[in-house]
């Protein structure tokens, strides 16, 4: 795989584009914002979403979806609730057989569909893979050691994608359990918010440990009910992602919930927030 397209010019999309460049690929990054494209192409930074990181001058950004879709593999890094719309916009430009690598974590609110199902509906000609695991974009961009799950039903394609993205500091581990990888990446966000609440209310480390452990058990049961395998949830895209997101102040879900819970009156505002 010589050329990789990346759809999404946020922190994670930019970090993945930089990783693919380090792996020796030609990379075109699509961003919605013209100022982000200009920042990347002219100043070789993404000051809006990934400040403080110098980008490879050979990394090229564009506002043209067709340009980014003209690749040997395309990473879909738009926010989960907008991923279907992004795939629909890409469909006229997509060549049959080009893999779509889902790099966004979540479950579609309007349909309760996994990202895999949403993308398959819009890009039926695309083989699908999922990239998910314990990753903060800033650490990946800095080249700090990172391991991640790459799930793909086709073993040969999976190996090609691992080779296309893997570097000395970014290690994809191949799996064929797309469902398990997606459930882990989505549900850990809910548990991270819950752990932030535990921290904010001063309920202690015992409570957080219990929440992570029992949350993992529920996450595993959900994955199995959807056709995933329990061992996937014990790996990088399950337990690994959960530990990272539910215990670090770099986690947006955890860091949002903790101060909110500290300040919120109990219990009336909780019901309001849930609604």
From Swiss-Prot:
Binding site for sn-glycerol 3-phosphate: 105, 133, 135, 188, 241, 251-253
InterPro entries the UniProt entry points to: 6-PGluconate_DH-like_C_sf, 6PGD_dom2, G3P_DH_NAD-dep, G3P_DH_NAD-dep_C, G3P_DH_NAD-dep_N, NAD(P)-bd_dom_sf
GO-annotated molecular function: glycerol-3-phosphate dehydrogenase [NAD(P)+] activity; NAD binding
Residues annotated as the enzyme's active site: 188 (proton acceptor)
A Gene Ontology term for the protein's cellular component: cytosol
Top-level division of the source organism's lineage: Bacteria
Entry's EC annotation: 1.1.1.94
Pathway terms, separated by semicolons: Membrane lipid metabolism; glycerophospholipid metabolism
Function recorded in the entry: Catalyzes the reduction of the glycolytic intermediate dihydroxyacetone phosphate (DHAP) to sn-glycerol 3-phosphate (G3P), the key precursor for phospholipid synthesis.
Protein name listed in UniProt: Glycerol-3-phosphate dehydrogenase [NAD(P)+]
């Amino acid at each position: 795989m010589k050329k990789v397209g990346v759809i999404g010019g946020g922190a994670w999309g930019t970090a993945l584009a930089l990783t693919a460049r380090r792996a020796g690929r030609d990379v075109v990054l699509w961003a919605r914002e013209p100022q982000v494209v200009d920042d990347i192409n002219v100043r070789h930074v993404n000051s809006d979403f990934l400040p403080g990181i110098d980008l490879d001058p050979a990394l090229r950004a564009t506002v043209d979806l067709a340009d980014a879709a003209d690749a040997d593999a395309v990473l879909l890094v738009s926010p989960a609730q907008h991923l279907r719309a992004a795939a629909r916009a890409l469909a006229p430009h997509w060549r049959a057989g080009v893999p779509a690598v889902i790099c966004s974590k979540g479950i579609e609110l309007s349909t309760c569909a996994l990202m895999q199902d949403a993308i398959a509906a819009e890009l039926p000609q695309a083989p699908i893979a999922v990239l998910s695991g314990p990753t903060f974009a800033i650490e990946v961009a800095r080249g700090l050691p990172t391991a991640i799950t790459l799930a793909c039903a086709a073993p040969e394609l999976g190996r090609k994608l691992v080779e296309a993205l893997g570097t000395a500091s970014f290690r994809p581990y191949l799996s064929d359990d797309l469902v398990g990888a997606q459930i882990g990446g989505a549900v850990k966000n809910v548990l991270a918010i819950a752990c932030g609440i535990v921290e904010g209310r001063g309920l202690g480390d015992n409570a957080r440990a219990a929440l992570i452990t029992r949350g993992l058990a529920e996450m595993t049961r959900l994955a199995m009910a959807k056709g995933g395998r329990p061992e996937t949830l014990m790996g990088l895209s399950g337990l690994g992602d959960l530990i990272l997101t539910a215990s670090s102040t770099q986690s947006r879900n955890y860091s949002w919930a903790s101060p909110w819970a500290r300040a919120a009156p109990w219990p009336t505002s909780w019901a309001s927030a849930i609604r």
